[in-house]
Amino acid sequence: AIVGTVIFALLAFLLPSDVPVDRNGKIDWVGAVLGTAGLIVFNVAWNQAPASGWDAPFESILLVTSILLLLLFGVWEHKFANPPIMPLGIWTAPSFLALILVVLFSFMANGIFLWYMVAWLQLLRGASILDFGVQWTPFGIVATLGTFLAAWLIPRLATQWILAIGSAAILVANLLLATMPVYQSYWAQVFPATLFMALCPDFVYVAAQIVASNSVRRRHQGVAASLVGTLNLYGNSLGLGFAGTIETEVNKRRVGAEAVLGFRAALYFGAALGLVAVLVDLSFVRVVKDVREGWSDPADQREVEVELEEGVSTAVEGRQ
């Protein structure tokens, strides 16, 4: 992180300034606030519930408030925003809604796996932080290799299958943890589960970006890519809220060694999310192998030509 900060700070001074393509562009600040606030409050409601309980009055208030904010966001984007920060027409693009569900469920399952793997090893098996760090090493190696493997597969395999591999990987990973005994050798189930889990983020993220880019119009590609990127962290966090509620309910009136039942229930829920992601992907996401060059849609090609003309004109004005 320190090295990255130094490098990016230097690049901020060394790189030339971007040439503005749309000098008169506007940002939909109202939509940004409504959408972000709605998602945050919804997340807080679910992640606070395991500790406070759903019978706490503020939980209902938070949940209702989040829904109202998201409804207001939709109304604002549809009726008043110009231009909208998230054009609602993007949801009618082929495979896009199904893609978002697959990505959300996959990353929810991913967050559940990560949290309960740490909890199982440290709380039930007594592993130290250093022990866990060593046992987590295979993740970094396989995840790095998975990035290159996903990129290699893109021109060779239909993207929905790459997405399915990532979702199936987190399904298997959660099942391996959910079915293991409290005390067991690391190599028996935790190690293979870590290897499977390492494939999920890169396969799902890379494939989802390809599907999003192929599904929407060129002008909406930035929005689609940003939404997929947001679901990466948001899904991880939201999944813990759902899983935490399940764990809390299962472990009511259970103490000691019986607490593992709550862990298992949460991990089975993560596996169920992975299974639903696989089924939705195979049923509704359809993108062929990406071997195109340029823009196949004439309207998109015209947008590129206009942007290039405006960019050249702006650059000439800047030099003058």
Which ranges hold each PLM region?
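Select subsegments of transmembrane alpha-helices in polytopic membrane proteins
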Residues: 27-36, 164-166
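Intrinsically disordered, low-complexity terminal tails of fungal membrane proteins
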Residues: 287-320
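Helix-loop-helix hairpins in multi-pass membrane proteins, especially solute transporters
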Residues: 1-31
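12-transmembrane solute porter fold
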Residues: 57-58, 83-254, 258-284, 288-289
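Phenylalanine-glycine-rich, low-complexity intrinsically disordered regions
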Residues: 19-21, 36-58, 73-76, 80
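Structural signal for membrane-spanning alpha-helices in multi-pass inner-membrane proteins
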Residues: 8-15, 42, 47, 70-77, ...
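Structural signature of hydrophobic alpha-helical transmembrane segments
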Residues: 1-5, 63-66, 136-138
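Flexible cytoplasmic inter-helical loops of multi-pass small-molecule transporters
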Residues: 18-30, 79-86, 291-301
